[in-house]
């Protein structure tokens, strides 16, 4: 029987619950269909060897439950950002109306799935449409982004945005007739520590 309050190990129950959650997440990931492509979200990785392994389909040595929890929390935060931006008057399209899935592209063995496209929004001095990418960052990453900008703060995220801007097929903007290539990205970051 598990004691809810073990004086010898006060975090015992929490540790046991987290262990079970981690096991379940690891099992769930193991059952997922493996990608047969290199995700554009990793192309900015400065480690050529890691990119080569990923391109060859070699899995990382055991992504642990903690990292899987972080990934899943990031997806939840992204959903919050979608809602907030829409409430603020942005026409944010996170699904391609033609496919019902994320906007995507495929070039050779590389594929990318973008978080969304902002078709129009409040008059803020920017030209619409915009590529939209969302990330949740801890306080240290958030501070680095504010101080240094995206390119210096995170090469992987910067590479991801640049790849999407250059490879995403042209889209028909809101109220438009002719397809246009996205030239600008609204990169939104949520500080998950505050």
Give short role names for the model-derived ranges.
Residues 1-131, 138-140:
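Metal-dependent nuclease catalytic cores that hydrolyze phosphodiester bonds in DNA/RNA
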Residues 98-194:
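Nucleic-acid nuclease catalytic cores
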């Amino acid at each position: 029987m598990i004691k809810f309050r073990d004086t010898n190990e006060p975090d015992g129950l929490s540790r046991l619950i987290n262990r079970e959650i981690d096991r379940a997440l690891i099992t769930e990931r193991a059952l997922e269909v493996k990608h047969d492509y290199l995700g554009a979200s990793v192309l900015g990785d400065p480690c050529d060897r890691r990119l080569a392994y990923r391109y060859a389909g070699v899995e990382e040595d055991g992504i642990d439950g903690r990292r899987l929890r972080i990934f899943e929390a990031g997806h939840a935060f992204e959903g919050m950002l979608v809602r907030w931006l829409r409430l603020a008057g942005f026409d944010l399209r996170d699904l391609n109306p033609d496919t019902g899935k994320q906007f995507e592209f495929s070039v050779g063995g590389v594929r990318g799935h973008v978080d969304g496209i902002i078709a129009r929004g409040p008059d803020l001095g920017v030209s619409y449409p915009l590529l939209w990418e969302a990330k949740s960052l801890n306080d240290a990453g958030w501070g680095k982004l504010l101080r240094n900008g995206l390119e210096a703060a995170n090469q992987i995220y910067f590479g991801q945005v640049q790849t999407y801007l250059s490879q995403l097929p042209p889209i028909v903007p809101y109220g438009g007739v002719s397809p246009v290539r996205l030239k600008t990205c609204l990169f939104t970051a949520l500080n998950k520590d505050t």
